[in-house]
Amino acid sequence: MANLYDLKKFDLNLLVIFECIYQHLSISKAAESLYITPSAVSQSLQRLRAQFNDPLFIRSGKGIAPTTTGLNLHHHLEKNLRGLEQTINIVNKSELKKNFIIYGPQLISCSNNSMLIRCLRQDSSVEIECHDILMSAENAEELLVHRKADLVITQMPVISRSVICMPLHTIRNTLICSNRHPRITDNSTYEQIMAEEFTQLISKSAGVDDIQMEIDERFMNRKISFRGSSLLTIINSIAVTDLLGIVPYELYNSYRDFLNLKEIKLEHPLPSIKLYISYNKSSLNNLVFSRFIDRLNESF
């Protein structure tokens, strides 16, 4: 049995703050995730240092690193805090969150999005809110840390102590044009293709930038006559003009009959896009969420 008198003398909130500092290795980021000031985090760390008679963290380069005592404390604390959180969730099982917020690029609407939604909706009580936003891995981590999203889909892996990230899907790109294009045929040469005007997706995402650099090398000095931040806008513009564009194959396949589009065959395949799905490790303590992840893993 725990010594409740000794526990009463110790502020258990300090251990939560310690674990948050350990996860981020940053006073300021720990403060952001806990919605308190960096000063409050620093004061709590000072109290812990006095309690354990150890600095717990020391400066390392531009950041901080845990001492051996800090490492040992985290080793034991992580399991105990997870167990405490699971106990609270079990007691409040009826109040567990069942509204899932997903952030991801428009690309998911034409790939494995249906699989995600299907896995979530196997629990009929789940409500889903989906935001079509292309973001960096850093912004994705911030959304997860601040609990503003349950699932985030990115084109670059999210690397964080508190986040689980895994590959979701690889999207093949293809070059398309209108089925009524007056010059492009199945036998069009590279030179004939390069004589046409192209569309381009506007994006600041590192993943898209890398792909566009490869495409720029492949179609060097091509003329870009239409730029847009929406894939649906781009594909609709291609359908009603003589423009050529590079879009995800699944998107083309979904709309080719309705919009009278055709694929332009190339000698070598275009670069593909990898998608990653990320979520907080602590979310697995939620029974509804953990079951969803199990279903998702079974679908791969």
From Swiss-Prot:
Annotated DNA-binding ranges?
27-46
Coiled-coil ranges (or none): none
**Which molecular-function annotations from GO does this UniProt entry contain?**
DNA binding; DNA-binding transcription factor activity
**Alphabetical list of PROSITE patterns matching this protein:** HTH_LYSR (PS50931)
The membrane-spanning stretches of this chain are: none
According to its UniProt record, which protein family does this protein belong to?
Belongs to the LysR transcriptional regulatory family.
Q: PANTHER family, per this entry?
A: HTH-TYPE TRANSCRIPTIONAL REGULATOR LEUO-RELATED (PTHR30118), LYSR FAMILY TRANSCRIPTIONAL REGULATOR (PTHR30118:SF14)
Q: What induces it?
A: Induced by LeuO, a monocistronic operon. Maximally induced in early stationary phase, repressed by H-NS via 2 binding sites in the upstream and coding region; H-NS may bind both regions to form a bridge which then prevents transcription.
Q: What is this protein called?
A: Uncharacterized HTH-type transcriptional regulator YbdO
Keywords (alphabetical) are:
DNA-binding, Transcription, Transcription regulation
Q: Does the keyword Transmembrane helix apply?
A: no
The extra comment attached to this record reads: The protein is quite variable across different genetic subgroups, probably due to its binding and repression by H-NS.
Q: Where is the HTH lysR-type domain?
A: 10-67
GO biological process entries: regulation of DNA-templated transcription
Biological source species? Escherichia coli (strain K12)
